[in-house]
């Protein structure tokens, strides 16, 4: 749906380096910096083991999904890391602005980062932020938001709940050459919500593609417990080659050690009130990542149901 790396953080950071410097922070600037999500706030954490030639297929699929998810997190947080590394260009009460500065990649465009602070209560701080682009020489009405987000603290500056939104089609419509990145050609928008105020930590990432793409949307849902155990689901919604809507789901669960289980299901009636869920397969694995139990509704070779190992070995 989108590439593992969005390849966008560099043009923000390079432009900022050219026009801003380090130092001269005010104490209030720290509030703005602390409100922005870091990679560790929303990345999936799973104890990864060295893969083997016979590692469980669904363990490998889980590992691949985590890598894809975390790479997208790196790129999204990279877009706003400039706020942590450099002083604001302007300060106006509860607002901070970085830029505008020219885009290294597209000289006809310029970029800015805007943050706005508001106080919900004496112990809760709310922050909104925007990464925006516009053609050089245009007025304020020409700014279009590429990325928007918000954060609300709970208990401390680094714990709370927030959202991040990437608006690929909005900047595409405005003429920004977003489709130069192959990973964004099919993307309409991407949404992330997260809450790290208490365990379990939760993160949801929803990818919405343009209506013309076969895979129209996908959703990652992740939760992490205090003991390091976790759970991740990935839903993919699209149509078959005969035009029939279908939803596939993989749900993976693991202990802090990395041992776990994954189930692959399909909803054959996603548009009906009562779903028709079909279990396509299950893998359970130990610390060595090798399947202790494996079930397939259709074996890839024989095309008949197959089972190896005992389901009693599954930890979930």
What are these regions (language model features)?
Residues 255-316:
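Hydrophilic extracytoplasmic domains
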Residues 16, 20-22, 282, 312:
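Secreted/extracellular small peptides and ectodomain modules produced from precursors
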Residues 129-131, 162-163, 201-206, 262-266, ...:
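Short polybasic amphipathic segments
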Residues 144-251:
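Short helix-loop boundary/capping segments
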Residues 1-20:
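Sec-dependent bacterial lipoprotein signal peptides
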Residues 79-177:
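Short N-terminal edge-element motif at the start of the domain
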Residues 22-125, 293-316:
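N-terminal "mature head" segments of proteins
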